[in-house]
Amino acid sequence: STLFPYTTLFRSRTGLIDQVDLVSSVSGGSITAAYFALKGKAMMEDFEAKFLSQDVEESLRTSVSPLNIVRLTSGGVNDSTGLQSWLDENLFKNATFGDVLRRRRPALWINASDIYNRTPFVFNQSTFGALCSDLSTFPLSEAVAASAAVPIVFAPVVIRNYGDRCQSAMPEWAERALGNSNSASILRANAEAIKRYREHTDVKYVKLLDGGLTDNLGLTGMLLARLGANAPYEPMSEREAVRMRRLLFIVVDAGRPPGGDWAKSVNTDASDLIQAVADTAVDANVRNTYDTFAAQLKSWNRELVDWRCKLPLEKARAMLDTNRTWNCKDLSFHVVKVTFEQMPDPGVRDKLERIPTRFKIEKENIDLLLDSAGAILRRNSAFQRFLAFDEKRGIN
């Protein structure tokens, strides 16, 4: 999940890497996303040497031992400091979200799971505003460690809730969601979580685990932004909404299909059963989240065209800063989902799907992913339609 997004971004040979405005990540993919948001294209110079070729698991507790079993009873075999310290020492060098914010593009949303409220937790300005905390001082390494904190392997990452010190009112979207019994369930659940943060009675500390528990594609942040929006153009600005012609979301899914031999016999090994239960929950969540996101995107496209066409032409032209002809209907949103199963070569596809999800990647698997991911994106039919749609006009 770490390498696939990286290779999809940089090996597609489409020039889109210069036009990325937002990266939303989950689990191991958050390492790639955070480093890209911090370094931009410069990450290509050293990411393979600094991370992909390293054995991160050397810094983690992975053996079965009495001491590790005791640690397991305390929440997880590894606390957050092992992975976080490795990331700071080798990759992020104590960088914070403030360092990313100063770069301005791309915006970075890292996704974890709030295991008390059973909701996604997005490391962005909106969430930290609700906690009355300062996102700009928060370490990238700690957010990444939370996003990738697989249960049992890692103890929860714990951050303090300052909600009782808030001087500002609850976010308007949260108040609206709580006051509307018909509000979307995902919006209402997150509004209730924010209410608990502010009340500070039950949640003095927010405890976070792997974002894949609640959203294994990292799409919830955008869904919440749209469902809680006050205007058709949000979370964009009016100017951005007027100037835009094309919006492309590339959803990278490094999930694997069902595998193993345990379904061939009557009996089921306990470890296989535990893994199957986890995979079932995650895969069902992935399907539902993606379908909801795709439907929301179509609806947003229609709403935004309608809003643009109702704007006074003088106001639109003032925001364009150009004399080019403007067509209010010239706006299209696209979503492209990239998966291993889209690899046409069955032999290569089988090898890709067998790559284990670990913090240690064998050299042959690195080479396989580097050769495959960009090619998968280029062959994707939805992506080809997007490129063909704009090949004579440029991408905006």
Name the predicted role of every residue range.
Residues 16, 40, 79-80, 100-104, ...:
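Extracellular/periplasmic catalytic domains that process cell-envelope and extracellular macromolecules
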Residues 10-77, 81, 124-132, 371:
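Patatin-like phospholipase
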